């Protein structure tokens, strides 16, 4: 197996899944800049930047999953997941039970975690 950085492995896995399933979409803050190779290969309809509102775009991911897409929601820093927990815990996680099994919201949520960016305590979880 080739030796890859963590970022390269994520990029490769996303590209592999996006090539295999046209329902896989990626969105998040500056995701088109973070994943330029994916944006070039799959286009703006599948690699979509989102506004700086984690709760809004995670909720959009839940809706996209309910509509049949397979979203990968990239939250820039793990610190910001907390502001989006309502969509994740009260909607995505409980949807199947609340709907008697009629609805599901399969999605992936990714976030960077760790220090070293010099962005301050609310951006690093160092």
Tell what function each PLM region has.
Residues 1-126:
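Thiamine diphosphate
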């Amino acid at each position: 197996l080739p030796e890859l950085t963590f970022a390269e492995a994520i990029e490769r896995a996303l590209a592999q899944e996006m090539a295999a399933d046209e329902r896989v979409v990626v969105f998040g803050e500056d995701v088109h800049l973070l994943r330029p190779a994916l944006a070039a290969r799959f286009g703006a309809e599948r690699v979509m930047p989102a506004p700086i509102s984690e709760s809004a775009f995670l909720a959009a991911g839940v809706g996209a999953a309910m509509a049949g897409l397979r979203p990968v929601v990239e939250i820039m820093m793990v610190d910001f997941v907390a502001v989006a927990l309502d969509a994740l815990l009260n909607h995505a996680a409980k949807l199947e039970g609340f709907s008697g099994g009629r609805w599901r919201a399969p999605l992936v949520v990714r976030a960077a975690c760790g220090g070293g960016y010099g962005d301050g305590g609310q951006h690093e979880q160092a």
